[in-house]
A protein has these predicted regions:
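Mono-ADP-ribosyltransferase
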Residues: 1-107
Length: 107
């Protein structure tokens, strides 16, 4: 299986609807603030994430199941990294640009 052998910082832009869904999904979980049931499509490069109002900066520990898609699709410019489904995220802080999150677990 594909895992990262180093810590990563990944970026994800989401619309308000998706962000609210992620919060709703995590509502009954005591250990996380955001929960994504599907795969989490992110960018390895800051400002290459999808340009939505809500932007997540996700700290991903080494050993996380994820795959770099930038060399297998025709969208190299996104530097896409897909994180395994069932991602649990903890919000650490917020700044004027990003909601800073730590990835806790995946499936």
């Amino acid at each position: 299986s594909h895992t990262t052998d180093t810590d990563l910082v990944l970026y994800r832009g989401v619309c308000e609807h998706v962000y609210e869904l992620m919060k709703q999904n995590a509502k009954n979980m005591t250990d996380c603030d955001l929960y994504e049931k599907g795969f989490l499509a992110t960018s390895l490069v800051k400002n290459q994430e999808l340009n939505y109002k809500i932007k997540l900066r996700i700290y991903v520990p080494s050993g996380t199941k994820c795959v770099y898609m930038g060399n297998v699709n025709d969208e190299q410019g996104f530097y896409e990294v897909d994180i395994m489904h069932s991602s649990k995220l903890k919000i650490i802080s917020m700044d004027h640009e990003y909601i800073n999150c730590k990835l806790l677990t995946t499936a």
